[in-house]
Amino acid sequence: MDAPGQHPRIVVGVDGSDASIAALRTAGALAGPLGATVEAWACWDVPPGYGLYLVVGIEGFEYAAKQSLEQALADAFGKELPAFVHPRLVRGKASEQLIEGSRNASLLIVGRRGHGSLVLGSVSSACVSHAHCPVLVVHAPDEATHVKATTGSKSG
């Protein structure tokens, strides 16, 4: 969490999906009122079984992640990236890196990438279970219309 006098820090997991773009937009909407910075994290790694790429080079995987991050930021915010948004390319498994990134964050925001209306994706599920800060799971716009909000109270 934040030390006294520090600005809140929001970490957003970005994979280029509609849900991650919605997560970026949500972070942008929260950042202003909170005076927060937003770190847009695109995590990448060499897939298992691609040992040859370690010899030939892994730049293609990093480049693809960078392109996906740039496109997601453009989709979320338009041509001009807000000054409070800071893109980050992070090598490693997304769930592990985002959980580690949550150590010094005020909030971690991820998209829901599940199969079906009740199942979280593996990254969002791991983050909810193991993050070191509060986690907000954001649905893609087409999923949000099918979600029933609950307060957690017995009456509602």
Regions flagged by a language model, labelled:
Residues 57-68:
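A short acidic, glycine-rich active-site loop
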Residues 15, 73, 113:
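Short glycine-/small-residue-rich Rossmann-like dinucleotide-binding loops
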Residues 107-130, 140, 144-147:
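Glycine-rich, Arg-bearing micro-motifs that act as flexible, cationic patches
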Residues 1-6, 19, 26, 77-108, ...:
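Structural beta-alpha unit
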Residues 74, 96, 125:
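Active-site phosphate/pyrophosphate- and oxyanion-stabilizing loops and adjacent acidic/basic residues
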Residues 2-56, 140-141, 155-156:
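Small/aliphatic-rich secondary-structure junction motif
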Residues 39-41, 86-90, 136-138:
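General small-molecule cofactor/ligand-binding pocket signal
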